[in-house]
């Protein structure tokens, strides 16, 4: 059970036996606490590999070696008022939010290699500020829009169910593998040529076609209570989403860095896919959750919606043999 503080009183969060949300007990906190890192002096390349740094981004990133990261994935606080485990972020004007981004973005650009790529997440409200800041330092290559599947209804506005991810690179020579992120889709109206399937395959489970990934993703499931990757982090990204970014923009063994690590999804997914990882997170509880998930990834490298070297549509577990 997870301890919850409500009006100064410790209470236990009661979960259903079917709830697979990852949480911590006191024994696990003691077990994983020694794995968390801090930085007080310049770090070597080896000292940032496969590490979780528990601290404020401004205090830690200045000690990272320059040009040390192959791929950076950033999921910063959006321009919304939200409580991240006791660390509150307050919504502000568009100009003030842009200034917030500009206060730390130059610091993280310093650690990117000359051939590195970067992805940064946002919603409709902050995406313009993200583009402006990123474009001042890097070359913006594309914008990915992904459908959250979840989303609260609205009476006086459109339901907000999509988010953006800006893709940028340091220079013109960057790594990108389109074949690594192909999607296996059902064929609704199969076309045949001379009686044979054209551009699709017929299997015992149905008719499927491998398609190249576009910049609109409608196959992502946001983590929820029945998924073991789920945590109590209020803005957790799906492992499947991060897996697409990692597979497309890094080689095996590359270093993937997340300066707003949260409960560890980027590091965990990088480890599952054979990459090195590093993250910075100021909330200790989230860092400990990340370490628990990383330990579990030693024996469980599965990623929901990704199997057989391809990404699958939602609700295809039977076809995947799961």
Map each language-model feature to its residues:
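PRPP-dependent phosphoribosyltransferase catalytic core
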Residues: 288-322
